[in-house]
Amino acid sequence: MEGGAYGAGKAGGAFDPYTLVRQPHTILRVVSWVFSIVVFGSIVNEGYLNNPEEEEEFCIYNRNPNACSYGVTVGVLAFLTCLLYLALDVYFPQISSVKDRKKAVLSDIGVSAFWAFFWFVGFCFLANQWQVSKPKDNPLNEGTDAARAAIAFSFFSIFTWAGQAVLAFQRYQIGADSALFSQDYMDPSQDSSMPYAPYVEPSAGSDPAGMGGTYQHPANAFDAEPQGYQSQGY
């Protein structure tokens, strides 16, 4: 396989953590991982309020349990997805098959775009529910900073995941170009589908096998001097 296919060198090389952490997509994964922790951590720790007059806790976002559940679910799943693809980034240089690398990069594009969309939905949902929340439900303003942090980092996550999708698409384009020769090129002399054998440049000298040597004129074929006119006797 050609070196550099889909953004990584030839398979079998030694693992280089310094090169890994310098990759833009790896940096964005780590940032997205941190953002997801902030989102679900803020909601789990301070997203539910207690009212002395009520026995059960309620969600800080307009008392809508779906808002808190959505933020926690998306945050946890995005956290796990980041870990999965960070592990894939570590293993990716060891993948020797160009087709397998292509599948990994395509999955990166799809998953990253998927999470960018879900973070966009989550940001809109949480921001809307926060705007319509009633002050009387939280007179002491408990957990307001955490609620705003979850909204803000949901917004930031849109761009980190979209950036991962863009970088993965760039890797796909570069990888497709670099793998083109190794996948499609075939030596004509080894191609059995060709109707005729390839032309072989004749070499100087004798050809004992009689296969493609230089043409040899028969000895004395054209060496005889032309004879003069011979009169016929009558």
From Swiss-Prot:
A Pfam family assignment: MARVEL
Lumenal side: 45-71, 125-148
TM ranges: 24-44, 72-92, 104-124, 149-169
The keyword DNA-binding is annotated on this UniProt entry: no
Gene Ontology, cellular component aspect: melanosome; Schaffer collateral - CA1 synapse; synaptic vesicle; synaptic vesicle membrane
Region (Disordered): 201-234
Subcellular locations according to the entry: Cytoplasmic vesicle, Secretory vesicle, Synaptic vesicle membrane; Melanosome
Effect of loss of the gene: Mice lacking both Syngr1 and Syp show normal brain structure and composition, but impaired short-term and long-term synaptic plasticity.
Main location: membrane
PROSITE patterns (alphabetical): MARVEL
Entry keyword set: Acetylation, Cytoplasmic vesicle, Membrane, Synapse, Transmembrane, Transmembrane helix
Topological domains annotated Cytoplasmic: 1-23, 93-103, 170-234
GO BP annotations listed: cellular response to leukemia inhibitory factor; modulation of chemical synaptic transmission; protein targeting; regulated exocytosis; regulation of long-term neuronal synaptic plasticity; regulation of short-term neuronal synaptic plasticity; synaptic vesicle membrane organization
Domain MARVEL: 20-173
Membrane topology: Multi-pass membrane protein
Family membership: Belongs to the synaptogyrin family.
Name the UniProt record assigns to this protein: Synaptogyrin-1
Organism (species): Mus musculus (Mouse)
Organismal lineage: Eukaryota, Metazoa, Chordata, Craniata, Vertebrata
